[in-house]
Amino acid sequence: MAPVCLFAPLLLLLLGGFPVAPGESIRETEVIDPQDLLEGRYFSGALPDDEDAGGLEQDSDFELSGSGDLDDTEEPRTFPEVISPLVPLDNHIPENAQPGIRVPSEPKELEENEVIPKRVPSDVGDDDVSNKVSMSSTSQGSNIFERTEVLAALIVGGVVGILFAVFLILLLVYRMKKKDEGSYDLGKKPIYKKAPTNEFYA
């Protein structure tokens, strides 16, 4: 209990008494105007500091005394209201939006614009057989059992299935014979012996 009482005021003093970071040390992100960089005001990395930022163009807000009283010497500015015509905001696309692009409708124009791929003569491709890939389903007969791979797989699968069935039947017969012989002894003696619980009185 004593260590907790000692650490509680110290913890409160550390967390509550001291601010984590003083306000003066926190800097805001500076915004650099790219136009100033293009005009050549800053050379070889001499970018403005926090104090220099805004020194070129002072707003009228900086000219006040700070007492809270505003100078009423400026005339209020009034802007004429411009009424824009109402434009409907829909997604309708007019038919003649792009007059340069049109679909040809005459058969002559269609024939002129048609692209016909070049055909390779059939006698050129007969000599080079290395590019042709034989499809396994079309290269041989349509009957699946005529293929040697399928027949070999069926024979091996059948043999494995028959062997599995024979071993399963043999296991069942063996268990049934073992049960009939009475090899299962229901009156087994326990492996451990319980210690006597005799009480001795002194």
UniProtKB/Swiss-Prot annotation:
Residues 24-149 are extracellular. Residues 42-76, 89-138 are annotated as: Disordered. InterPro entries: Neurexin-like (IPR003585), Syndecan (IPR001050), Syndecan/Neurexin_dom (IPR027789), Syndecan_CS (IPR030479). It is a single-pass type I membrane protein. Residues 175-202 are cytoplasmic. Residues 1-23 form the signal peptide. One of its GO terms (cellular component) is plasma membrane. It is found in: Membrane; Secreted. Keywords: Glycoprotein, Heparan sulfate, Membrane, Proteoglycan, Secreted, Signal, Transmembrane, Transmembrane helix. One of its GO terms (molecular function) is identical protein binding. GO terms for biological process: cell adhesion; cell migration; cell-cell signaling; inner ear receptor cell stereocilium organization; negative regulation of T cell proliferation; neural tube closure; positive regulation of exosomal secretion; positive regulation of extracellular exosome assembly. Pfam families: Syndecan (PF01034). Residues 48-62 have a biased composition (Acidic residues). It comes from the Eukaryota. Shedding is enhanced by a number of factors such as heparanase, thrombin or EGF. Also by stress and wound healing. PMA-mediated shedding is inhibited by TIMP3. O-glycosylated; contains both chondroitin sulfate and heparan sulfate. Ser-44, Ser-65 and Ser-67 can all be modified by either chondroitin sulfate or heparan sulfate, and the protein exists in forms that contain only chondroitin sulfate, only heparan sulfate and both chondroitin sulfate and heparan sulfate. Changing residue 65 to T: Reduced glycosaminoglycan attachment. Glycans are attached at residues 44, 65, 67. The keyword Transmembrane applies. Residues 105-121 have a biased composition (Basic and acidic residues). The keyword Ribonucleoprotein does not apply. The chain crosses the membrane at residues 150-174. Cell surface proteoglycan which regulates exosome biogenesis in concert with SDCBP and PDCD6IP. Belongs to the syndecan proteoglycan family. Homodimer. Interacts with CDCP1 and SDCBP. Interacts (via its cytoplasmic domain) with GIPC (via its PDZ domain). Interacts (via its cytoplasmic domain) with NUDT16L1. Interacts with DNM2; this interaction is markedly enhanced at focal ahesion site upon induction of focal adhesions and stress-fiber formation. This is Syndecan-4. The gene is Sdc4.
